[in-house]
Amino acid sequence: FPLLPLSKTVSFERKVLDIRQMPAQVLFPHWDDEFEFIYVLSGMMEFRVRQKAFLVSSGEGFFLNTGEIHSACTYQSYDCRFVIYRICPSVLFQTEDNPLYQKYIKPLVDHPSFGFLTFVPKVPWQKYILEMIRKMNDICERPVDGYELKINHFVNEIFYYIFHNVNL
């Protein structure tokens, strides 16, 4: 499952994976230079980040900051299909010297305790983020001209909710 760095012409990548079809049924430890949103489409898996293990079920998800080492594996006999969105920071703002990036995004992503977030539907603001990730998935399943603009919109909306709900 090696992912190559995103090119300068691509602002995000979407990949749907089945943990059972991966080598050794494992997403081996790795990190990415991009943000990642992970959404479990069906089943359950064990997800690891910062030496912590989480059981993630259908309808739940994760946010991973850039540079966070993470891995995943099967949990008991469960199958698991999940989607990963790798998002270039430029989706939020074209340059890091943008005042809005400096004011809202940089303090979050540079904070040492902000490595990841879990999203569960029982928390209202997290449920809303999960709904946005589902909408991103629907749009990517049936892309039409301009779909990248909708993805950009949802990513900005997600960061708005993260900014307003995460206390660092």
Set out the residue ranges of the language-model regions:
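A hydrophobic/aromatic-rich effector-binding and dimerization subdomain
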Residues: 1-13, 73-137
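Residues embedded in well-ordered beta-strands
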Residues: 36-38, 84, 157
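A conserved hydrophobic position in a structured secondary element of the catalytic/binding core
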Residues: 64-65, 87
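Residue-level recognition of conserved beta-strand edge/terminus positions
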Residues: 65-67, 73
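An amphipathic alpha-helical interaction segment
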Residues: 120-168
